[in-house]
């Protein structure tokens, strides 16, 4: 079996046929979604996979309609999941730039509907709600972008049941928003407005399909992605689903040569459940994931028209080497920089210590326009233009994909799987993950000064890296693979998880080693608050000590 043969087998025509077949309509816990899962079941079965379907309980939310008028003029708007419905909310409309929403005075926004810029984001809504705003309307791109307004990752628990925003939210296009801002300015800063929204939030059964190709070992690599969509969702995410189907077609005949198994796991609940599908699947299979899942390869938003930037895709320290190899082999990319995973991309498996690589592998170059401005406010200044002006809009149709770009991106994923399934030594570097954690802890120690002592943990991480490097030379490959997996089940949660490994942190930005984030606040706290924060931080150090001790035992066993 030659790796180049696997890459050469990727077929752009088949990929686009799969995309069109999967695009059964807007897929949001409805009949179109059922049809799409039926299509996927047939495609995976025809490819030669062992296919199972599950229905897992989850909380989802779908926008059912919205109306908005200001100063007697009606505007087309969309409302957003996980926000309350509003039946004719009447209030004055005011404009507040998005970079001032966190500092606006209550006098400025209280009891008013606030018009602001960018994609509909929960932190912005939360800041305005805390200041007494009655509702929020966002100015997005040339097309109105769908977003989910929630910090709750997956379905709520009793602890997070009341963490949703309590005011209605809508979005309008950049053109309408610009004209409305001009009218507000002419009117002296306020206009009478009326906002109505209908949002249906409910518990339902979230479908998950798993297509397995069994190799020589029960340990497995998984390729994951979401089926649900805004509009036809060709880019987001029929492209990622088609990637999974194409990889299954290519790999199934090679099962007897595979050293490890592969599972293609696709779910709903991403767009309208804030990752409720991946979260529910993790919860249902946690022990197996922790023990036997070697790698999570997330497949999302592939092959976009004009998507030529291939240097920024996410990876963990343990998978950066594999990412570089795959991008170089499959796409000739030699300047990949990558980035750390953010709290997004269905990354629901950190608590189980699963190494992850990729989500998208290609993005748009920076561009001018309203959509670019909106993406910039969401993703930061960045070095890309995101996923295109059609992302999360009704214009995300198959013509927004470039067949050659799609095949190129799928070849990158094919390279990842070729190495992960057929290499004698699994190309996941546990020592790199250990060393990155050590470096992050050194940075936290420098900030904390004498307030906290991480020296014992840092010394243990040095010993752990040395032990892994020594056993990598002496162990047989399979034994070392098992050893590394046990180490990563301890180290990855320390690097990425703030709370319990069995629950899921909020869908908000977090620093590396988030359990130590209070260090950044120590200097600004009162003595009483600082002492309380130090109690929490000392407990975090205990967690670091316990997990690194277990990891060192695993490395030396």
Model-derived regions, located:
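Active-site-adjacent substrate-binding region
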Residues: 305-435, 496-500, 504
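Catalytic-core environment of secreted peptidases
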Residues: 9-33, 43-50, 112-118, 125, ...
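Acidic/histidine-rich catalytic neighborhood of metal-dependent amide-processing enzymes
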Residues: 122-123, 205, 229-318, 346, ...
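C-terminal non-catalytic alpha-helical accessory regions
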Residues: 407-415, 420-557
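Soluble metallo-hydrolase cores and metallopeptidase-like ectodomains found primarily
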Residues: 73-104, 157-235, 246-261
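Extracellular/luminal Protease-associated
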Residues: 77-168, 334-335
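Second-shell loop/turn segments in exported
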Residues: 2-9, 23-31, 84, 95, ...
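Noncatalytic luminal/extracellular "stalk/propeptide" segments of secretory-pathway proteins
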Residues: 2-13, 17-110
């Amino acid at each position: 079996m030659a790796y180049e043969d696997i890459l050469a087998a990727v077929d752009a025509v088949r990929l686009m046929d799969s995309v069109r077949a999967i695009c059964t309509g807007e897929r949001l816990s409805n009949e179109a979604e059922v049809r799409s899962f039926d299509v996927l079941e047939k495609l995976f079965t025809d490819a030669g996979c062992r296919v199972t379907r599950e229905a897992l309980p989850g909380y989802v939310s779908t926008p059912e309609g919205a109306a908005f008028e200001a100063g007697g003029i009606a505007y087309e708007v969309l409302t957003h999941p996980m926000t309350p419905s509003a039946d004719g909310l009447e209030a004055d409309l005011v404009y507040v730039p998005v970079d001032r929403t966190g500092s606006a005075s209550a006098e400025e926004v209280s009891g008013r509907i606030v018009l602001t810029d960018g994609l509909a984001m929960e932190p912005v809504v939360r800041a305005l709600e805390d200041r007494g705003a009655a509702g929020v309307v966002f100015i997005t791109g040339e097309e109105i972008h769908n977003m989910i307004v929630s910090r709750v990752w997956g379905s709520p628990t009793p602890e997070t049941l009341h963490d949703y925003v309590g005011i209605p939210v809508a979005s309008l296009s950049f053109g309408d928003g610009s004209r409305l801002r001009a009218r507000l300015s002419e009117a002296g800063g306020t206009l009478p407005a009326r906002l109505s929204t209908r949002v249906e939030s409910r518990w339902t059964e979230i479908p998950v399909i798993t297509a397995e190709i069994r190799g020589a070992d029960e340990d497995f690599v998984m390729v994951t992605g979401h089926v649900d969509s805004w509009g036809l969702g060709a880019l987001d995410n029929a492209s990622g689903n088609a990637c999974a189907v194409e990889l299954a077609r290519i790999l199934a005949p090679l099962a007897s040569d595979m050293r490890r198994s592969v599972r293609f796991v696709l779910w709903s609940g991403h767009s309208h459940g804030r990752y409720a599908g991946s979260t529910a699947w993790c919860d249902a299979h946690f022990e197996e994931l922790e023990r036997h899942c070697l790698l999570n390869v997330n497949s999302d938003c592939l092959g976009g028209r004009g998507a030529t930037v291939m240097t920024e895709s996410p990876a963990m320290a343990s998978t950066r080497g594999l990412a570089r190899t795959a991008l170089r082999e499959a796409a000739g990319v030699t300047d990949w920089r990558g980035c750390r995973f953010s709290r997004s991309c269905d990354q629901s498996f950190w608590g189980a210590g699963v190494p992850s690589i990729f989500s998208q592998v290609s993005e748009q170059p920076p561009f001018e326009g309203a959509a670019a401005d909106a993406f910039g406010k969401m993703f930061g200044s960045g070095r890309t233009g995101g996923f295109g002006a059609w992302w999360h809009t009704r214009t995300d149709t198959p013509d927004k994909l470039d067949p050659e770009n799609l095949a190129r991106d799928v070849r990158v994923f094919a390279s990842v799987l070729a190495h992960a399934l057929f290499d004698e030594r699994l190309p996941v570097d546990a020592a790199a993950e250990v060393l990155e954690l050590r470096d992050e802890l050194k940075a936290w120690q420098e900030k904390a000064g004498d307030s906290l002592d991480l020296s014992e943990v840092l010394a243990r991480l040095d010993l752990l890296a040395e032990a892994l490097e020594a056993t990598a030379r002496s162990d047989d490959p399979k034994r070392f693979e098992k050893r590394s997996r046990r180490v990563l089940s301890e180290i990855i949660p320390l690097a990425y998880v703030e709370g319990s490994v069995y629950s899921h942190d909020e869908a908000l930005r977090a620093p590396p080693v988030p359990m130590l984030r209070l260090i950044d606040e120590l200097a600004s706290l009162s003595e009483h608050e600082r002492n309380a924060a130090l109690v929490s931080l000392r407990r975090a150090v205990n967690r670091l000590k316990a997990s690194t001790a277990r990891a060192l035992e695993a490395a030396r066993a």
